[in-house]
């Protein structure tokens, strides 16, 4: 197993241009596929999750051209649904942002489609989405365990009508349903059961759908109306914002050991909720400066916070390791959906924080973190989870440094993360 030793860093300073957002990249690729016309996507993320989506689209007959560095994609839209005369099997790795939307989109056309992935994907729930699609007439069969991939879709199109979907586990289910609803055979009314998690991710979806010319009526996130007879139309060009979750590591670095760290590609005009991570750092005591397309974090003594972070679940992980450098006990609440991500992130985070000496209380949907007087060095297991590796890079700011096991797992969203991270050292 590959290991990366991060020696203690005294201070950081610099500027990082953040790679494209995973959430926006895969949503935009799918909408461009369903749209009339050719779309040029710029600042597309070049990572495993995007490659799985692109490979699947190519297998389904979608034509596109990538630039030499894979960050510009010119894609010819199908002007409607994806169909296939031959049965197709699509391998989607551990990419939830490809599995969930494709599962929904493939019900719109004609054909037999089997969706598979890595072993961890078989543990990541999809039942709430499948239940909703079945209410609209979809024929979907589980191949192993009910509620989980792999699965086969026997597609004949999707009916309109009223549909209920559970909202308190993952916003990706609602995102997938929203994106396919305009191409159903009639108007769709989506009723959300329970409290909707990660609302800002739904805002991303709605903003992109509007960019492609589709109207959705949002009734306070409890009900969504999607009128019939709509079509996606390419806006011509789509600029993929920098990934706000990826920005969180560099902003935290500035807050803990700045100096001054500036991230570009994301700022106050962002459609991503994870930019609110900077507000949490500010509550902890960091000096934050906002521009339209940049954020600057400057170091200051940090103090613990006790906050509901349901709206920024991915970026909230960075607060868990930043808490090791804050005075007092930090509590991160309402984060049950950490448990259904690339790994059970609540359990993994608690385990690894304890290795460096933190006192940790792991609840069903919260985590309490009290830093030790002196942090220990340790070998951090990353659970094939890109965010675990990036979060624990913050331990380079301890006097003892840290060793990251399997650092290449960052290829899921940020292949050269550790190169960029090293560039901040003073």
Curated annotation (Swiss-Prot):
It is an enzyme of class 2 (transferase). 3-phosphoshikimate binds at residues 22-23, 27, 170-172, 198, 314, 337, 341. Keywords: Amino-acid biosynthesis, Aromatic amino acid biosynthesis, Cytoplasm, Transferase. Pathway: Metabolic intermediate biosynthesis; chorismate biosynthesis; chorismate from D-erythrose 4-phosphate and phosphoenolpyruvate: step 6/7. It is found in: Cytoplasm. Its EC number is 2.5.1.19. GO terms for cellular component: cytoplasm. The active site is at 314 (proton acceptor). The keyword Cytoplasm applies. Phosphoenolpyruvate binds at residues 22, 96, 124, 172, 345, 387, 412. Catalyzes the transfer of the enolpyruvyl moiety of phosphoenolpyruvate (PEP) to the 5-hydroxyl of shikimate-3-phosphate (S3P) to produce enolpyruvyl shikimate-3-phosphate and inorganic phosphate. Monomer. Belongs to the EPSP synthase family. This is 3-phosphoshikimate 1-carboxyvinyltransferase. It comes from Shewanella oneidensis (strain ATCC 700550 / JCM 31522 / CIP 106686 / LMG 19005 / NCIMB 14063 / MR-1). The gene is aroA.
């Amino acid at each position: 197993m590959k290991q990366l030793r991060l020696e203690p860093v005294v201070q950081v300073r610099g500027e990082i241009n953040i790679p494209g957002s995973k959430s926006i990249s895969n949503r935009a690729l799918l909408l461009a596929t369903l749209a009339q016309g050719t779309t040029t996507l710029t600042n597309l993320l070049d990572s495993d999750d995007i490659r799985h989506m692109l490979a699947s689209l190519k297998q389904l007959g979608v034509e596109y051209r990538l630039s030499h560095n894979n960050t510009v994609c010119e894609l010819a839209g199908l002007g409607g649904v994806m169909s296939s005369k031959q049965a197709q099997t699509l391998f989607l790795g551990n990419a939830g942002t490809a599995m969930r939307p494709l599962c929904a989109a493939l019900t719109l056309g004609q054909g037999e489609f089997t969706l598979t992935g890595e072993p961890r994907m078989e543990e990541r729930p999809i039942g709430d989405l499948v239940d909703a699609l079945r209410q609209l007439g979809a024929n979907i069969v589980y191949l192993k365990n009910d509620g989980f991939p792999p699965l086969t879709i026997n597609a004949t199109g999707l009916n309109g009508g009223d549909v209920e979907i559970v909202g308190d586990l993952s916003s990706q289910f609602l995102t997938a349903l929203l994106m396919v609803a305009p191409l159903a055979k009639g108007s769709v009314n989506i009723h959300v059961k329970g409290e909707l998690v990660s609302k800002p991710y739904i805002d991303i979806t709605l903003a992109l759908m509007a960019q492609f010319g589709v109207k959705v009526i949002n009734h306070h996130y409890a009900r969504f109306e999607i009128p019939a007879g709509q079509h996606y139309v390419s806006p011509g060009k789509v600029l993929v914002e920098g990934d706000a979750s990826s920005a969180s590591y560099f902003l935290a670095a500035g807050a803990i050991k700045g100096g001054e760290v500036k991230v570009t590609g994301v700022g106050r005009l962002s459609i991503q909720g994870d930019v609110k991570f900077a507000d949490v750092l500010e509550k902890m005591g960091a000096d934050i400066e906002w521009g339209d397309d940049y954020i600057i974090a400057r170091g200051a003594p940090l103090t613990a916070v006790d906050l509901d972070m349901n709206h920024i679940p991915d970026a909230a992980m960075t607060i868990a390791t930043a808490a090791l450098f804050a005075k007092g006990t930090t509590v991160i609440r309402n984060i049950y959906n950490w448990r259904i991500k690339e790994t059970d992130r609540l359990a993994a985070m608690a385990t690894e924080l304890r290795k460096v000496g933190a006192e940790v209380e792991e609840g069903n949907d919260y985590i309490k973190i009290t830093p030790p007087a002196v942090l220990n060095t340790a070998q951090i297991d990353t659970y094939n989870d890109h965010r675990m590796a990036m979060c624990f890079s913050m331990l380079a700011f301890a006097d003892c440094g840290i060793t990251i096991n399997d650092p290449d797992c960052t290829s899921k969203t940020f292949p050269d993360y550790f190169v960029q991270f090293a560039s901040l050292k003073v």
